[in-house]
Amino acid sequence: MSKVISLLSSKGGAGKTTISTNLSQGLFRMGKRVLVADSDPQASSRDWSLQAPDEYNMVPVLGVGAKTMEKEIASVRDSYDYIIIDGAAKMEAAKMVPTIKVSDLVLVPVQPSSVDIWAIEDLIDVLKARLDAVGKPLVNFLISRQITGTVIAGDVFEVLKEKELPILNARTSQRVVFAEALSAGLSVYEAEPDGKAQQEIEALIEEVTGLIDG
């Protein structure tokens, strides 16, 4: 049975689709059976998949509905090693509960800004309530789109620690290649092999798989 990893945030622009597509493609290139489940009405991951050049072997993407999430994931769960759910943007936290229920791990990407932290307060409450009730899923913050050479990511790290949920050591940075790859239907593995962005994704994969497979 597959492990389900969800990228959830109540705020748009947090990097959910960028992380979902790159994380999944990295696992796919490792020989894993991987599916991206796109639950965002904006269909960003599905659009990404449609842009992929024919010469590249890219991870498959399936559109799923937030209301039918549990049934749809159950129907494909035995066919993959990992299912990565690209969560809907700007959705009320309470409506994310079906996605949370099917997840083994929820990653909450947070840009280094106070506004981003304020925007996910309700989601944090929902996740904590689920953990208190049933003891799962695993939940981790992921600092995303940090600007290298600044101290603000460190400041946000200190604020996130007060939320009493773990924070991944792996982070993603604000790099042009992430945006360029997404627009071209690629991941950083194809767009800039062995570059710094790929190194960040590989560090993320190592940490995430250690959490859910370890």
Regions found by a protein language model. Give the residues of each.
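Inter-motif core of Ras-like GTPase G domains
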Residues: 94-114
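Beta-strand-loop-alpha "switch" segments that mediate conformational coupling across diverse proteins
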Residues: 147-149, 157-187
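Inter-lobe coupling/hinge region of RecA-like P-loop helicase motors
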Residues: 179-202
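Structural beta-sheet core signal
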Residues: 36, 85, 108, 141-143
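Motif I (Walker A/P-loop) of helicase-class P-loop NTPases
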Residues: 17-21, 120-121
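Conserved C-terminal guanine-recognition region of P-loop GTPase G domains, centered on the G4
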Residues: 120-135
